[in-house]
Amino acid sequence: MQQTLPNIKDFTKPELIRAITSLGEPAYRAAQLHQWLFSHRTRSFDDITIINLALRQKLSSIYSIRTATLDDCRQEYRDDHEIPTTKFLVRMHDDETVEAVLIPAENRITACISSQAGCSLHCSFCATGKTGFRRNLTSGEMTDQVFLLNDHLAEHYGQTITNIVFMGMGEPLLNMTHVLDAIETLSNHNYRYSLSQRKISISTAGIIPQIDLLARLPHKVKLAVSLHSAIQTNRESIMPAAREYPLPALKKSLAEYNRLSGQPVTLVYMLLRDINDSPEDAKALVKFAKSLFCKINLIDYNAIVNIKFKPVYTGKSELFLRSLLDSGLQVTVRKSHGASINAACGQLVTESRLHLPEEPH
């Protein structure tokens, strides 16, 4: 069987420059090629008429151009939105699958995309960790997710993605080179699809060395930290990575991020019944957040099959919220999206190994 040629879209932009210059071509040829791949979204070297025939033939002999595809989707309509929350199964060129979600809200439509196939952090409330870590995604595979979801949105609803969050499967800061390269592509104002970096967020479990590095880079993306508990032993019990990145060190890192970037941090706190919803938990969160330039995003838990956690009762979550507000913290409450379609990360990939229903019409 003939060996598949490497996918040229798997290169970061610096890697693409090195590949093209190694063929004796000037670096600007790589910039032209990159624009055709990620702005024009060409699928054949023959279409790239801005470069000469000899180079097109050379590239065709050593590289392929392959694109991810939408394999399936599930939708959940809400009364206050014309556009449903839609969860997609995205198939990569090697048949690896990840998840991406379109989330409508007032005045915005957010694409939640994956940065890894699986995850190595094994957060106990997350379905992705149950699938294990398989590989990092390339920057091209991340941009493909955005383009595919944007195409779906344009075709069915005549709208476009307004925000992007790297909050799907995987830990973005453990694949930082390709995540940042994808962000550079998605925010290139010379490309057909372009979004301000201020409309792009990276969500992390709190990988301190990479947070420190991100603070020193010129990118203007937003940072969200999955906190989920401000009590160290409790956080370790639901997020094993917290043992390596303890709360005092994390708080110091976030304060430095505030200072160097001038940007606030979002602390994401998912309420879990009888796990992190007590008055003591609220007090610990207030103490952790009080001196930081931050806002807190409280979210409901989407129940996951074969995982023990449960959503918090409404009355208890309201008391928790009131404790934070009374302490002067800025808090937003994110209502649960996609409960009926298993929108929590990792569930659709797990189910895809068995059977998926046809896309609703």
Curated annotation (Swiss-Prot):
The keyword S-adenosyl-L-methionine applies. GO terms for cellular component: cytoplasm. Its EC number is 2.1.1.192. PROSITE patterns: RADICAL_SAM (PS51918). Binds 1 [4Fe-4S] cluster. The cluster is coordinated with 3 cysteines and an exchangeable S-adenosyl-L-methionine. Keywords: 4Fe-4S, Cytoplasm, Disulfide bond, Iron, Iron-sulfur, Metal-binding, Methyltransferase, rRNA processing, S-adenosyl-L-methionine, Transferase, tRNA processing. Belongs to the radical SAM superfamily. RlmN family. This is Probable dual-specificity RNA methyltransferase RlmN. It comes from Chlorobium limicola (strain DSM 245 / NBRC 103803 / 6330). The lineage of its organism: Bacteria, Pseudomonadati, Chlorobiota, Chlorobiia, Chlorobiales.
